[in-house]
Amino acid sequence: MYNAVSNITAPVAIQGQFWLYTCPMAEKVTIFIDGGNLYKRLKERGVLPGKRFNYAKLIDFLLRGRSLSSKRYYVGAVRNYDQTARSQEMVEAQQKFLSALELQGFLIERGRIVYDHKIREKGVDVKIAIDLVIGSVENEYDTAVVVISDTDLIPAIKYVISRGKKVEYAGFAERPSLGLARESSLSVLLLPDDVSRMAN
């Protein structure tokens, strides 16, 4: 089944299994995933909890046959902030999940979680921005694929593109970030059917 190419971004957007973009096999790709944000988006779509999400299928979908330089997963580290059994269960569940990702070859980058009036991640976006910039300077990749939704990363994306690298924004077709799509070289938008195929 082929899906229409979206016209919300320039120069080209990809939806589902159809794309108008040639991918040289020698092209080096680094994938940056904001884990907390991706979890929320999947949960909104009924994928989590109760189902497993196949990150290997997501990576294959984003690579499209190109060479993987590295895949990075950024997340706030859960703490037992109130010394309860429930919080400890959450700590252990996250550690188990991240260990499983490491076995799949992911580099795990941990930020902090602040517990005040609401639970907030801190430091994750900064880590992504720094790694995007350093990776472009040190020629670690030709293309950065960013699975994010925070427009605070736009300055880093603009800098990376100014150095002759490409940045692909990967989001969900129902609610893409128009700001990130506009500033990126390419947008890859997952349709509901794509997400369903990645859920075990």
Show which residues each predicted segment covers:
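Domain-level signal for Mg2+-assisted phosphodiester chemistry and nucleotide/NA-binding surfaces
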Residues: Y2-N3, T9-R120, K166
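Nuclease catalytic cores that cleave nucleic-acid phosphodiester bonds
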Residues: Q95, S99-N200
